[in-house]
A protein has these predicted regions:
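Anion (oxyanion) recognition and catalysis
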Residues: 113
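PIN-domain endoribonuclease scaffold, especially VapC-family toxins
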Residues: 2-8, 18-110, 128-144
């Protein structure tokens, strides 16, 4: 009897915090979306300042981005995910929340839904109202 292999899509926050996350909380087969690479890339460029702490933060973010690029072949946000994004936006609005403020999160959820993968995140509340569309797997945030 073989154990079932767990597969899942990682939210961007998992990649940012991954070194401190217990490996047993993550799926055996991990995937990311192209949206996650976009968020990580933007993060490198959005660090303000040129002092030592800003340079260190920029380097840390660049390291996370480079590791993600080397480890994963991201799942694209394609036309099927775009259609799913509409359904997800409607579900978020029906739950009383504003989809416009959370576009990247909802695009990642759309990729997870169309790829039929559970979404692993340290921010499960970001995906409230989507329970009928995508399975969200909460992951504990590492202690800072």
């Amino acid at each position: 009897m073989r154990a079932e292999v767990r597969r899942g899509l990682l939210d961007t926050n998992i990649l940012v915090l991954r070194r401190g996350i217990e490996p047993a909380e993550l799926p055996d087969e991990m995937a990311i979306s192209a949206v996650t690479l976009a968020e990580l890339s933007a993060g490198v460029h959005l660090v303000d300042g040129d002092d030592a702490p800003a340079r260190a933060e920029r380097a840390r973010r660049a390291d996370v981005l480079q590791r993600a690029e080397n480890e994963f072949d991201p799942i694209p946000f394609d036309s099927e995910a775009a259609r799913m994004f509409g359904r997800i936006s409607a579900a978020v609005r029906a739950s009383g929340r504003t989809p416009r403020l959370r576009v990247a999160d909802l695009m990642i959820a759309a990729v997870a839904a169309t790829a039929e993968l559970p979404l692993y995140t340290t921010n499960p509340d970001d995906f409230a109202g989507l329970e009928e569309i995508v399975r969200v797997v909460p992951v504990r945030r590492p202690l800072q």
